Amino acid sequence: MDEQTFAQQYMAELNPQQRAAVTAVNGPVLLLAVPGSGKTTVLITRLGYMVQCCGIPPEHILTMTYTVAATQEMRSRFGARFGAALAGRMQFRTINGLSAVVLQYYSRRYQRQQPQLITKESDLTRLLMQIYTQVSDDYPTESTLKELRTAITYIKNMALDEEGIAAIETDLPDLPQLYRLYQAELKRRGWMDYDDQMVYALQILRAAPPVLAHFQQQFSYFCVDESQDTSKIQHEIIALLAGQSRNLFMVGDEDQSIYGFRAAYPQALMEFEKVWPGAQVLLMEQNYRSGSEIVDAANHFVARNRYRRPKVLQAVCGDQGPVEIRRISSREEQITWVFDQIRQGEQLAVLFRNNESALPLIDLCERQGVGYRFKKSDLTFFTDKIVQDVTDLLHFAAAPRNTDLFLRLYYKLGLPIPKRQALYACAQSARSGRPLLEELQRCPDISHRIRRALPDVQAALESLPGKTAAQALDTLRDDAGYGAYLEQKKMDSGKLSILGLLGAQEPSPARLLQRLEELQALLAAHQDPEDAPLILSTIHSSKGLEYDSVVLLDVFDGILPAQLEVCCRTPEDTRHYEEDRRLYYVGMTRARRRLVLFDCPALPSAFTQEVIFNLPEARARREQEAAEAARLRGPTPAPFAPMPAAAPRTLPPVDLKDLAWVGAPVEHVVFGRGTVTEITGRFLTIRFGDGKERRLDGPTVAEHHLLRSLESP
């Protein structure tokens, strides 16, 4: 087919950037595609162009993407557009799937027995439990095993050495030893996991030139979708395979890289021209999904990131709907607002960072008979260490002579005693029938500090059965020593907050325990109704999807972002922080017509405040105030002359504590002198001489020399 006919038949609706991507066939090409830009349509059209216009045999083209579902969808869409016969000759694979093919070819060619792939989840779980109990005295929970699996995947996909493994921050006990034992046991059993397929494939391609040559002869054109989610080892496999032909078409967007915990390696997109000299870098910046206000807000937000390539989202759909800011006074109000919307007939997609954020809303929906859809595959809340601790503590309060519970809990109650003293209390309680904590007080060699603390702990626990569930949780945290234990171990107390929201509906601790069991059973049996008005999803699971109305839930400081920008002290901290920004951005860009954000003074959100700061009405208000202030003040003194408008920042993040502190006198180029009254995330709240308080973006005013402190702290 000639190019003109192909263009008329398949490219008539494509914009110039999309057309340029379709016809970029030879050599290394990086296509940076913003959310909603039609990248899958372009990728499929390009495959058709390569075959029908360039005469490239479809068997010579290898298209790789992130998931099996994505490969199936791509094959289906290609077949619908260019015919099933042609689709049957194309290769669509995950990189894991390609690695399996490399291993099979190597085994046949050299008559080598390859390790057996672990395909049963139960086999892997038993193996992980076995090695965990060799290293730790604790029995691993489901969430602990998930964390260990994630860590192993990260290690293999990042190709970390022992030093790199030791540097991983984790709550797991002795991760290097766990990993060594895991690998040794795999080798002993002749097993490999899914990530090992890539590890072995890379080793083979490096060490066996005939194998590499075979695949380079089979494939001369390589297309990679979702390359921002591709790991370091996967990029190395791709580089080896495409190294001879150099015909590599990589599609991605570093602004949407949100799988760092799985070893996603967006640096490969940033370094593409360095790895592939002479490469083309193309952009697709037109967003066909979201309304202009949503696109504008998302564009302003993501532009603040440092580790990105300059690009500007452009809304095609016009003014479809607003970014809606809902003022609330508590976390609970999010839940009631969403539920009220559903009761009024609205359809909403509620997105959040962690699956547990959905539980209070699910609890309410189950009580009221409202349908919902919920992807629950990663829900480990009920087996989390903290949740199990709390349920154990509530059970122990009702059964103060239960030795099994006591031995699991005593050191979590602010009672740092040796185990022999705990065992002494167990033996004495078994003889006397008295509560364990009472017998512990009678232990002859217990320290004075513990002896003084025990009556308060015992009184706190004894009071729990007579309290509401919410009151009991507060008592556990504040009076029974458990909150201090969490702080000492630097454990996230977010699970306690979710338990508190669930407990707010229950009259007693016993009823909360019962409700947790009910919810766990309900979720295990839950079937998603197709017509449910409410969709509940993590932002990660919503990647690639879109909804008319999106609500971002629980995007508060400490959750999303996990830590504030002012707390970033190392490049690694900054990378984690910027991935949190990208996660928020991905959540925003799922919305077509309506994006709802919650603004809660009691639970600050630096990200949401930044969005509010850049909304059209806020910008217009600032411009009006600046113009009025300038009129009243007259010409600005030279030392404070504002700099010209700049592109998104290239300077390092500003530590606001170096610029100002609460109570500090400051001077602003437009508003004059004032006093800092609050620092929240990146924002300074300043009361100026005209009596007005203004919230200013710290890095912006510092970068443009708009603000100075008049004193040193």
Q: Which residues fall in each region the model found?
A:
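P-loop NTPase Walker
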Residues: 1-112, 213, 296-299
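Conserved helicase NTPase motor core
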Residues: 6-7, 12-23, 27-38, 62-63, ...
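Short glycine-/polar-rich loops that comprise or flank the Walker A/P-loop
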Residues: 27, 56-60, 87-88, 244-247, ...
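Helicase P-loop NTPase motor core
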Residues: 35-43, 47, 277-280, 285-372, ...
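ATP-hydrolysis module of ASCE/P-loop NTPase motor domains
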Residues: 87-89, 108-196, 419-420
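Conserved beta-strand -> loop -> alpha-helix junction used to position metal-binding or nucleic-acid-contacting
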Residues: 87-102, 370-393
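Conserved helicase C-terminal RecA-like lobe
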Residues: 168, 393-617
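C-terminal accessory regions
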Residues: 555-692, 696, 705, 709-713
